[in-house]
């Protein structure tokens, strides 16, 4: 299992036992991949802790109804996009979506001090890394990993929010409010993907730019909705 984790995240794990019930884990590698590995380890540990407590409560005679409600609540949070938690599927980490965003656009979407970053991640079933002042002109580099449809939904939302067209801008703000307030459903993702692409809107070019890679089985990587202002290419040459 450890070697599989190291191959998946391209990091090195060094594990030392510090007590009878705990271990100390050192993770070496690219900072973003270190973060992903830590989040996955923490999430899996939390779910194992929940499962262990649920089994303990069941053995002690607690009502099955309460346990079933807790299980359904957890499943809704982890299985909205697939039968397995998305962070356990390697393909969701193979091709991060990377682009640059203006500072004021970052604040509009993620809030002052990135207040809404965590809730957007949780509700969209993705992980998002923001690197402020990544370019000489002060742009923020945004890296997104997660299921393809979730990344495509976020990309569509970013495009709409950054558009100078009043209709698309309003649509983007509606999508932004939704992902801030509640988890996305499969219906949300299907609706976003089915929206006809708006071509010819070059107003996004000075607002959002960079590399966008959405690797899914499709005839051409350029068939990404609402991206006329993006430069699309492979993240890893």
UniProtKB/Swiss-Prot annotation:
GO terms for cellular component: cytoplasm; membrane. InterPro entries: KH_dom_type_1_sf, MOEP19_KH-like. Belongs to the KHDC1 family. GO terms for molecular function: RNA binding. Residues 96-155 form the KH domain. This is KH homology domain-containing protein 1. It is found in: Membrane. The chain crosses the membrane at residues 7-29, 33-50. Keywords: Membrane, RNA-binding, Transmembrane, Transmembrane helix. It is a multi-pass membrane protein. Disulfide bonds: none annotated. The keyword Transmembrane helix applies. Signal peptide: none annotated. CDD domains: FILIA_N_like. The keyword Iron does not apply.
